[in-house]
């Protein structure tokens, strides 16, 4: 009797767990759909002139000013092919004397500190605003003395550059530039959450049906 109760508890625990995983995937599906819609709206929106109080993800903006290459930051990153390198994050001062962190794009690891990555034309830039994502537990600590960063901690960035920035990073859009290669922002994000949800729910139903079958079979025997 005791073993039967333990078995029943275990089966219903597994079913509940898998149902919870399915529900979590539906929550993630809603989040991903909202994200795709938000990015889509930003990509379709006309660019507006940058000002420091803009606090909207994926807002397309235009800014005019100058880069400060002396305080450039190298953020460890993989490109679309999985090759290791760096995102080049450069302070930019607008004509209104506001400071922005510009993600100018990706470079190979051996291009770090090379002069070729700092050749720019003109003072006007266009891009999308992204809210800075805080460091998660899986990322290593920044090696600030080597100017190798794994996450953007604004407190440390402010100390490193001697400037103050808000929590939004400007991602440069310029198809004419190849080094650094600007990140291409699209709405083509992987979205398999519905498939995963159906899988978890299907497993839960299968386990429940097998449980009923074997329980009925044991009663007959």
Which positions does each model-derived feature cover?
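Surface-exposed, charge/polar-rich loops and edge strands
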Residues: 1-52, 59-221
């Amino acid at each position: 009797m005791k073993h039967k109760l333990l078995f029943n508890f275990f089966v219903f625990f597994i079913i509940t767990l898998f149902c919870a995983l399915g529900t979590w995937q539906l929550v993630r599906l809603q989040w991903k759909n909202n994200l795709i819609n938000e990015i889509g709206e930003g990509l379709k929106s006309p660019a507006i002139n940058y000002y420091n109080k803009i606090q909207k993800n994926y807002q397309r903006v235009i800014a005019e000013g100058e880069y400060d290459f002396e305080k450039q930051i190298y953020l460890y990153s993989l490109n679309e092919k999985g090759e290791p390198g760096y995102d080049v994050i450069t302070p930019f001062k607008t004509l209104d004397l506001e400071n922005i962190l510009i993600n100018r794009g990706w470079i190979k690891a051996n291009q770090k500190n090379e002069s070729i990555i700092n050749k720019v034309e003109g003072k006007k830039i266009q891009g999308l605003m992204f809210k800075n994502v805080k460091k998660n537990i899986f990322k290593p600590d920044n090696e600030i003395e080597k100017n190798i960063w794994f996450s953007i901690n604004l407190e440390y960035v402010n100390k490193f550059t001697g400037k103050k920035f808000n929590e939004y990073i400007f991602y440069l859009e310029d198809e004419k530039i190849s080094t650094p290669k600007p990140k291409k922002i699209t709405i083509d994000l992987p979205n398999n959450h519905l498939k995963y949800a159906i899988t978890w729910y299907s497993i839960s139903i299968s386990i429940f049906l097998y449980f009923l079958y074997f329980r009925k079979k044991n009663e007959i025997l």
